[in-house]
UniProtKB/Swiss-Prot annotation:
An annotated Gene Ontology molecular function: 4-(cytidine 5'-diphospho)-2-C-methyl-D-erythritol kinase activity
Signal peptide: none
Protein species of origin: Geobacter sulfurreducens (strain ATCC 51573 / DSM 12127 / PCA)
Protein name, entry field: 4-diphosphocytidyl-2-C-methyl-D-erythritol kinase
Reactions catalysed, as given in the entry: 4-CDP-2-C-methyl-D-erythritol + ATP = 4-CDP-2-C-methyl-D-erythritol 2-phosphate + ADP + H(+)
BP GO annotations: isopentenyl diphosphate biosynthetic process, methylerythritol 4-phosphate pathway; terpenoid biosynthetic process
Taxon lineage: Bacteria, Pseudomonadati, Thermodesulfobacteriota, Desulfuromonadia, Geobacterales
Protein family according to the UniProt entry: Belongs to the GHMP kinase family. IspE subfamily.
Pfam families the UniProt entry points to: GHMP_kinases_C (PF08544), GHMP_kinases_N (PF00288)
SUPFAM superfamilies recorded: GHMP Kinase, C-terminal domain, Ribosomal protein S5 domain 2-like
Length: 279
């Protein structure tokens, strides 16, 4: 049967502004989202079936319908006249529940892969519409470009000129509840007045707009996040920020050597750390 092996990249948020709470309980956001070359590997295979099987083997990641990748495959299988079995194997490299979008990226990759394997030929716009029913970040990974994301994250505008950078990501392995972060966030309205550029000429220009409203909640509760930011800046980073609701921190470097040294320094603290490129 047909098979695909695909990479599902992580993301960082160069900016995350929380604008307002919506009547449906979600929040309107304004984000700059950037993919990075820290990737899960996903193998998708059509079988004689029936049914969908997901195997991951990572603690905390379900293998059945509780896995967002399973639900992605199920959503496309429902649109297919043929009903083959679908086997999905996920090799996790992206830390789980870390603010890096790993689950959403896995789901987006499965949507694109199953769309190809089943010959559905659904356009990107339709895949993004399906994706947002699975998770707010899923459309971004289908979009596949650095983007300004608005609404709950599904309204995407390409940012066409963004310099490549070395990114060091550090996860201190502390559990952070996204729901708790948003429940405790005090909205100020200040972010809405900040103008966001549509292009950047240098890494320094990117660093000038780094901001994450959720840090005001997460860092007081988990001071290690602020500590990591300070250490990365001391190691030569041009800028550093918490990604998403945390706990992962990332930092931008212009030179590979400095990024690799900083990642090694962080791993010496028994934290997950990687030096990767933007994509």
């Amino acid at each position: 049967m047909k098979k695909l092996t695909l990479k599902a990249p992580a993301k960082v948020n160069y900016r995350l502004d929380v604008l307002r709470r919506r009547p449906d309980g979600y929040h309107d956001l304004r984000m700059i989202m950037q993919r990075i070359d820290l990737c899960d590997e996903i193998e998708i295979c059509l079988t004689d079936g029936p049914g969908i099987r997901v195997v991951c083997g990572r603690e905390g990641v379900p293998d059945g319908p509780g896995n967002i990748a399973w639900r992605a495959a199920d959503a496309l299988l429902a649109l297919s006249a043929d009903k083959p079995g679908i086997d999905i194997s996920i090799t996790k490299k992206i830390p789980v529940a870390a603010g890096l979008g790993g689950g959403s990226s896995d789901a987006a990759t499965v949507l694109m892969g199953v769309n190809e394997l089943l010959g559905l030929d659904l356009p990107e716009k339709r895949l993004r519409e399906i994706g947002v029913t699975l998770g707010a970040d899923v459309p971004f990974f289908i979009f596949g470009r650095t983007a300004l994301a608005e609404g709950i994250g599904e309204e995407l505008t390409a940012i066409d000129r963004v310099p490549a950078a070395w990114i060091v990501v550090v996860n201190p392995n502390v559990p952070v509840s996204t729901a708790w972060v948003y429940q405790n966030l005090q909205l100020t309205g200040e972010a809405a007045r900040v103008k966001i550029p549509r292009f950047f000429e240098s890494v320094a220009e990117v660093c000038a707009i780094l901001s994450n409203d959720l840090e005001s909640v997460t860092i007081p509760r988990y001071p290690v996040i602020g500590e990591i930011k300070r250490e990365l800046l001391a190691a030569g980073a041009l800028g550093s920020l918490m990604s998403g609701s945390g706990p992962t921190v990332f930092a931008l470097f212009e030179e590979e050597d400095a990024a690799v040294r900083a990642a090694e320094m962080m791993r010496a603290r028994s934290w997950f750390a990687a030096a990767v490129r933007t994509i």
